[in-house]
């Protein structure tokens, strides 16, 4: 399978990329950390490709997509994983620029990637778009209102996209569950260590994603066993 993943430099995105590569799939990924991208390129040379791209910047995303589509063709799976969370605080104490950054990556970034890659998938007539949501995209918690708002938006955006896709394709909002990542540690501090590691999660999540297809179009999905 040809798989495009955003946010591959750490956490869930990196764990997914590593699992897919280890299991014979071709991965094209992006992330914001130049050193991490360099490491991925060194560790996983062609046919895999990794680029330093901020998904919040539509021109950069478009140029990246042109390169990937030119070498790889339309992906079988497009996984929008890149995301940010705000520093825990009551909504009225979250600075406007911080809220804006969360929205720019978590919502606009997803739209930028969809705009760049999905036309090629539609033209081919097949493919699955998986947009990572969250348990906080289906419930709420204090002090993470900006993050909750963006993940609720992803649920709606993905379900609307599902209504627009041709028969045979799918768009699925996916709740990955609660995993010990840098992002979770921003909220739970050392308490995050009690949750599964990203690599353990990927062993179940990566094949679960590959099992998603047209039958799942518009369905809110969750990775079994990690819903906590």
Residue ranges and their predicted role:
Residues 134:
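Residue(s) in the substrate-gating loop at a strand-loop-helix junction
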Residues 89-91, 98-100:
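Substrate-binding pocket helix/loop in short-chain dehydrogenase/reductase
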Residues 119, 163-164:
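Alpha-helical segment proximal to the catalytic Tyr-Lys
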Residues 9-10:
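Conserved glycine-rich cofactor-binding loop
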Residues 167-169, 173-176, 181, 190-228:
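C-terminal helical subdomain
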Residues 23-38:
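Conserved glycine-rich Rossmann-like NAD(P)H-binding loop of the short-chain dehydrogenase/reductase
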Residues 114, 150:
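Active-site helix of classical SDR
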């Amino acid at each position: 399978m040809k798989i495009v993943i955003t946010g591959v430099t750490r956490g869930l995105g990196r764990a997914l990329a590593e699992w897919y590569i280890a299991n014979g799939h071709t991965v094209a990924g992006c992330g914001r950390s130049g050193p991490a991208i360099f490491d991925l390129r060194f560790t996983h040379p062609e046919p895999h490709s990794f680029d330093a791209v901020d998904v919040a910047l539509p021109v950069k995303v478009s140029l990246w997509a042109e390169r990937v589509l030119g070498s790889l063709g339309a992906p079988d799976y497009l996984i929008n994983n890149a995301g940010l969370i705000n520093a825990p605080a009551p909504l009225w104490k979250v600075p406007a620029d911080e809220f804006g950054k969360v929205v720019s990556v978590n919502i606009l970034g997803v739209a930028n990637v969809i705009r760049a890659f999905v036309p090629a998938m539609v033209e081919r007539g097949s493919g699955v778009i998986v947009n990572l949501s969250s348990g906080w995209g289906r419930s709420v918690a204090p002090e993470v209102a900006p993050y909750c708002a963006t993940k609720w938006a992803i649920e709606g955006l993905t379900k609307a996209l599902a209504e627009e896709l041709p028969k045979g394709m799918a768009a699925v909002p996916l709740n990955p569950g609660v995993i010990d990542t840098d992002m979770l540690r921003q909220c739970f501090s050392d308490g995050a260590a009690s949750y599964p590691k990203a690599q353990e999660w990927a062993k179940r999540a990566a094949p679960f994603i590959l099992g998603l297809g047209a039958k799942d179009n518009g369905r809110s999905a969750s990775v079994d066993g990690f819903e906590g």
